[in-house]
């Protein structure tokens, strides 16, 4: 916990990872903290074919490309669940449920959003394969 980062980013979806890249390019020391899967909700997306310059790709593959790019800037990405943020004299202290803590001058919260899931038997099994939570995102896949 001795190191004080210029920026700690909570969340590793596209917004969090983009912020990390901009921090690194601005010569700021930064770290990304993700509670679950690197890439956030994107990594759980079945198929993406509207991202310019990439073509058809799974969300997990695109998320891995994001993570690889972030790591190419020597940005540390860790898994932890932050449950407390305290203001100290010169920085902020982030505490995780596993007992670890981190110090940062600035914090970016990029934790995204989650949809209201269907309370149906086997709904998770068919999410992205017939069950969709985004008409704008997935409507293309259901056309004739």
Regions found by a protein language model. Give the residues of each.
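FAD-binding core/adjacent interface of flavoenzyme oxidoreductases
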Residues: 1-10, 77-144
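N-terminal Rossmann-like FAD-binding beta1-loop-alpha1 element of flavoenzymes
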Residues: 5-31
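Residue-level detector of alpha-helix initiation sites
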Residues: 13-15, 37, 113-115
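Glycine-rich, phosphate-binding/catalytic loops in enzymes
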Residues: 26, 48-49, 123-127
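Short, acidic/turn-prone active-site loops that include or flank metal/cofactor-
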Residues: 37-38, 56, 136-137
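N-terminal Rossmann-like dinucleotide/flavin-binding domain of flavoprotein oxidoreductases
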Residues: 43-101
């Amino acid at each position: 916990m001795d190191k004080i980062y210029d920026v700690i980013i909570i969340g590793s979806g596209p917004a969090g990872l983009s912020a990390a890249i901009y921090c690194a390019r601005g010569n700021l020391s930064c770290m990304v903290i993700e509670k679950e899967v690197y890439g956030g909700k994107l990594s759980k997306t079945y198929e993406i074919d509207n991202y310019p310059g990439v073509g058809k790709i799974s969300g997990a593959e695109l998320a891995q490309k994001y993570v690889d790019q972030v790591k190419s800037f020597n940005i540390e990405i860790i898994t932890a669940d932050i449950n407390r943020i305290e203001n100290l004299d010169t920085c902020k202290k982030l505490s995780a449920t596993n007992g670890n803590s981190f110090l940062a001058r600035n914090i970016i919260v990029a934790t995204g959003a989650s949809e209201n899931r269907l309370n149906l038997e086997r709904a998770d099994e068919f999410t992205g394969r017939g069950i969709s939570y985004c008409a704008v995102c997935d409507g293309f896949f259901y056309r004739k």
